[in-house]
Amino acid sequence: MPPKVRFQKDEIVAAALNVARKEGIDSVTAREVAKELGVSVGPIFTWYETMEQLKADVCEQAKCLYQEYIERGLSGSIPFLGVGQQYLRFAKEEPELYRLLFLRRPDTVSGGAMEALKFSQDLARESLMRIYHMEAWMADRYFRDLWLVVFSFATLIVTDDCPYTDEEMSNVLTEVSLSVCKAYKEVPGLAEGRFDRDAVFGALVNRE
């Protein structure tokens, strides 16, 4: 008879995720995961041929957790502000998972920041289109522009170098969100990247 499987695959992934949350993805080794489970390394290799495969599953679980934060943000009265606030909350509460998803070079475990941006756009697109009356391509560009601001704050947070309060960051997000939305809707060709930059800036700075 084959030996009885003591741990299911999802239990091993959950243990590996706990290690990653506490110590980072590079600490997800067979020994550390086995220690988290309180067993030898044997059960891990019942399900996985390599640790890279397990790390890839940890990354997928990190995405699921991140998605929960984003969906909470989208349920608010001002979707993008809610998304931005939840993104920053994720960085504060799960700094190691944030590093895994957003601050690694693309490899077999994580697709890196640009893949995470696309994942985020896919989550937010429908709400932005519906509430802000944007076509899909404009919603994606709008999200990209605002995400770059939020990414900057989140990176300061996870590197423990953020001097701004939650209120200050929220105010910046509101200002930038309003400015970009207004500009995309009122400056012809801006969202498409085909506008007379000199003329637009000239008219703006010459206002009293």
Predicted regions and their residues:
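Hydrophobic alpha-helical connector segments
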Residues: 57, 70-97, 134, 146
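Short hydrophobic/aromatic patch on the recognition helix
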Residues: 37-48
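Amphipathic alpha-helical linker/stalk segments
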Residues: 60-82, 120-131
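Amphipathic alpha-helical segments used for helix-helix packing
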Residues: 90-109, 153-163
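Basic, helix-initiating cap at the start of DNA-binding domains
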Residues: 1-23, 30-32, 36, 53-56
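Alpha-helical DNA-contacting segments of helix-turn-helix folds
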Residues: 20, 54-62, 101, 109-117
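Amphipathic alpha-helical packing segments from all-alpha helical-bundle domains
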Residues: 108-133, 140-145, 151, 171-182
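C-terminal peripheral helix-coil segments that are non-catalytic and often amphipathic
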Residues: 126-130, 163-208
